[in-house]
């Protein structure tokens, strides 16, 4: 099938790790030919979070339609493709299985190479649509389930030099938003309120100066919930804008200061922002500001909002790198909810 002989490499990406069903056709790992995302936010809203059974059911309903639509928008057939890339893990096992089984079936039926992709590798490679990577580079990955600093010295070589010891930042955002009675997904709502508020509560900045690159957000979450509870006990209703701004200031301070310190220590050429929380305006603005001041020679890459949340273009981009390195998954590949980034 000589995919590598052709000038262009066309990969179909499939993503179903949580509550988005997505498919995308990507050319040469850096050009989006089509990208289709079916979101389930409305279905999970009334539960205040993702319900795994509902997510799986939605994936079953959407997967075929989404793949067909991605091929149609790209104006290609399965025979034009060089391979199929799919999120293998981590994520919700029932959700992952839908995408993995669809990818395995398509690859098998059309005799195409299959490439399993780590979900976080996908988030990092979403930045590949912005510019070429120059190593060494550092990624700040911030999402609902992950908060990590990932050092890369070459394509597909990941070293986690810092990670959360408890809650991920996105998780803390959602829990705090719920306490304030905000709609799901909470991170977006907190970010909006924070714009019009002040950091009047000065919540703790955990592990800010401990010398490590690790994070902790459970103390901040508890402090926020206790402060709100105590104020309400006294019959006071705090300004939600100030509460949101104070919470966000604490998270952003820690994320940005540790990221800048790690980037300096490792002398990176590029600094990448990745993951769902990369859409947060407060975080984006602060990172741009600090990099200008502290790391004038480092290129900061921030993905467009459309590529921050879960999508399949990023999976196809990461999959293309593995594909061109000759990596292949067997047709008996299984969903792996505990897949580690450093093991791929």
Curated annotation (Swiss-Prot):
Q: Can you cite a GO biological process for this protein? A: tRNA threonylcarbamoyladenosine modification
Q: GO molecular function, one example?
A: N(6)-L-threonylcarbamoyladenine synthase activity
Name the GO cellular-component terms.
cytoplasm
Pfam short name (any one): TsaD
Q: Which family does it belong to?
A: Belongs to the KAE1 / TsaD family.
- Grouped into one coarse class, the protein's main location is cytoplasm
Query: What is the official name of this protein in its record?
Result: tRNA N6-adenosine threonylcarbamoyltransferase
- Positions binding Fe cation in this chain are 119, 123, 310
Q: Which cofactor does it need?
A: Fe(2+)
Per the UniProt record, which EC number(s) apply here? 2.3.1.234
Q: How is the cofactor bound?
A: Binds 1 Fe(2+) ion per subunit.
Keywords from the named record: Acyltransferase, Cytoplasm, Iron, Metal-binding, Transferase, tRNA processing
Q: What class of enzyme is it?
A: transferase
Q: Which domain of life is it from?
A: Bacteria
Instruction: Output the PANTHER family linked to this UniProt entry.
Output: TRNA N6-ADENOSINE THREONYLCARBAMOYLTRANSFERASE, TRNA N6-ADENOSINE THREONYLCARBAMOYLTRANSFERASE, MITOCHONDRIAL
Q: What does this protein do?
A: Required for the formation of a threonylcarbamoyl group on adenosine at position 37 (t(6)A37) in tRNAs that read codons beginning with adenine. Is involved in the transfer of the threonylcarbamoyl moiety of threonylcarbamoyl-AMP (TC-AMP) to the N6 group of A37, together with TsaE and TsaB. TsaD likely plays a direct catalytic role in this reaction.
Q: Origin organism of this chain?
A: Listeria innocua serovar 6a (strain ATCC BAA-680 / CLIP 11262)
Q: Which residues bind substrate?
A: 141-145, 174, 187, 191, 280
């Amino acid at each position: 099938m000589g995919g590598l002989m052709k000038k262009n490499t066309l990969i179909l990406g499939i993503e179903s790790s949580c509550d988005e069903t997505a498919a995308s056709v990507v050319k040469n790992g850096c050009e989006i030919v089509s990208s289709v995302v079916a979101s389930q936010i409305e279905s999970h809203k009334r539960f205040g979070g993702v319900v795994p059974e509902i997510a799986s059911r939605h994936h079953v309903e959407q997967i075929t339609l989404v793949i067909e639509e991605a091929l149609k928008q790209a104006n290609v057939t399965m025979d034009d493709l060089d391979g199929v890339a799919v999120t293998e893990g981590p994520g919700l096992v029932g959700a992952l299985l839908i995408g993995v089984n669809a990818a395995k079936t398509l690859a098998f039926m059309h005799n195409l190479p299959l490439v399993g992709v780590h979900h976080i590798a996908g988030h990092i490679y979403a930045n590949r649509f912005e510019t070429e990577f120059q190593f060494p580079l550092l990624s700040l990955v911030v999402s609902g389930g992950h908060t990590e600093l990932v050092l890369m010295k070459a394509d597909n070589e990941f070293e986690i030099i810092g990670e959360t010891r408890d809650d991920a930042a996105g998780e803390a955002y959602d829990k705090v938003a719920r306490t304030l009675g905000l709609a799901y997904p909470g991170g977006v709502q907190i970010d909006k309120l924070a714009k019009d508020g002040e950091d009047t509560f000065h919540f703790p900045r955990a592990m800010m100066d401990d010398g490590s690159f690790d994070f902790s957000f459970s103390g901040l979450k508890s402090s926020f919930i206790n402060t709100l509870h105590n104020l309400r006990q006294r019959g006071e209703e705090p300004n939600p804008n100030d509460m949101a701004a104070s919470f966000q200031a604490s998270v952003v301070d820690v994320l940005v200061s540790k990221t800048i310190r790690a980037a300096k220590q490792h002398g990176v050429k590029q600094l990448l922002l990745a993951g769902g929380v990369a859409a947060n305006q407060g975080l984006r603005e602060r990172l741009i500001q600090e990099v200008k001041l502290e790391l004038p020679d480092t290129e900061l890459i921030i993905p467009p909002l459309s590529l921050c949340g879960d999508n399949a273009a990023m999976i196809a981009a990461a999959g293309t790198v593995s594909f061109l390195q000759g990596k292949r998954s067997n047709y008996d590949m299984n969903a792996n909810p505990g897949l580690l980034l450093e093991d791929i």
